[in-house]
Design a protein with these regions (language model features):
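Helical element adjacent to the flavin cofactor pocket in flavoenzyme catalytic cores
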Residues: 1-49, 56
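Conserved FAD/dinucleotide-binding core of flavoprotein oxidoreductases
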Residues: 65-70, 100-102, 122-123, 162-199
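A glycine-rich dinucleotide-binding beta-alpha-beta segment and adjacent secondary-structure elements
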Residues: 142-153, 206-270
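Generic, well-ordered alpha-helical scaffold segments in large soluble proteins
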Residues: 14, 18-22, 31, 61, ...
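Hydrophobic, well-ordered secondary-structure elements that form the walls
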Residues: 59, 99, 170, 196, ...
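Mid-domain catalytic core of redox enzymes
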Residues: 33-161
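A conserved FAD-binding loop/helix module that cradles the flavin
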Residues: 267-288
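Active-site-proximal substrate-binding core of FAD-dependent oxidoreductases
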Residues: 37-38, 289-305
Length: 305
């Protein structure tokens, strides 16, 4: 993996600086209430504080369900398109732990100073164990013996924490969007966190005594705090029927929507999720082509998977 110096927030700061350098404006804490549409064309948005922002185009990087089912009047959309968007699969399957540590963990399987501490570590013993963890998700539970993908980025970038302290990031599978069909509770969240911490303790005795703080994000937090429907970090399941020309839905796979000048550029579009920026970059290429002002610094969207 590549590491951003200063943490993943540095990526956001760099993108913000680039936009501002080009004359753009960033407004944080400004949720959108609805997309304004007149005569089949998008011409702006209404923010949740009532402000209107108008423009020649509206470009949404929200997931396809949130964009069209929550913020666009259904009457403005073709019925078949609405049906396909409603059928788009977007079940979340993962959770996240961000852990502040008083000191680096000591894994019994790794010698002191092992270079593997600087890499990506997986907590799993076999394919069968991963399958059992997935079975829990299918039954509507978080995994009792999860598959954890763990990194300690401060091993590479110590500027992220005070001297001697560390930060651990745990990507955890599996966690369903609902627990046996009901919403997550705080007790569920805390139980999920304990399960993850207990598992790490088995591989690194004494680990839990070094924990200073834990931020837990189940699919509930990912939806409520980050805006990811059902907590799906890829804005839609990456199944064969939802890839390539079928992403997000057949007939609208080139970042355009049925509403003129309403574009989609998030991970619900091709090629899907991950920290790569390809959906946004491809959407930008298509928008420039639509404007008949292609950038000499950007190849056609189809050239980028």
């Amino acid at each position: 993996w590549g590491f951003a110096r200063g943490g993943m927030g540095s990526i956001t700061k760099a993108l913000t600086a680039s936009l501002q350098a080009a004359g753009g404006t960033v407004r944080t804490g400004s949720g959108i209430e609805k997309v304004l549409v007149r005569n089949g064309r998008a011409y702006g948005v209404v923010l949740d504080n009532g402000d209107e922002v108008q423009g020649r185009r509206v470009i949404s990087n929200m997931d396809v369900k949130r964009t069209f089912l929550k913020h666009v009047d259904e009457a403005e959309l073709p019925g078949e398109f609405v049906r396909r968007v409603k059928a788009f699969k977007i079940r979340g399957s993962s959770g996240k732990l961000n852990i502040a540590l008083d000191c680096a963990p000591k894994f019994t399987a790794l010698p002191e100073g092992s270079p593997h501490m600087k890499g990506d570590m997986h907590f799993t013993d076999s394919i069968e164990k991963m399958e059992r963890a997935y079975d829990d998700w299918k039954a509507g539970h978080y995994s009792v013996d999860p598959f954890q993908d763990m990194m300690i980025p401060t091993m590479i970038d110590p500027t992220m924490t005070p001297p001697g302290k560390h930060f651990m990031s745990c990507f955890v599978q599996y966690a369903p969007p609902k627990i046996e069909g009901r919403d997550w509770t705080d007790a569920d969240r805390d139980g999920f966190a304990r399960t993850c911490l207990d598992q790490i303790e088995k591989y690194a005795p004494g680990f839990k005594s070094s924990v200073l703080h834990v931020e837990v994000r189940t699919p509930r937090e990912l939806e409520n705090e980050v805006g990811l429907t059902e907590g799906n970090i890829f804005q839609g399941e990456l199944t064969f029927d939802q890839l390539l020309f079928n992403r997000p839905v057949p007939g609208c796979a080139q970042y355009r929507s049925p509403i003129k000048d309403l574009w989609i550029c998030g991970s619900s579009t091709h090629p899907g999720g991950g920290v790569m920026g390809a959906p946004g970059r491809n959407a930008a290429s298509e928008i420039l082509r639509d404007m008949k002002t292609p950038s000499k610094d950007m190849s056609d969207a189809y050239a980028v998977l």
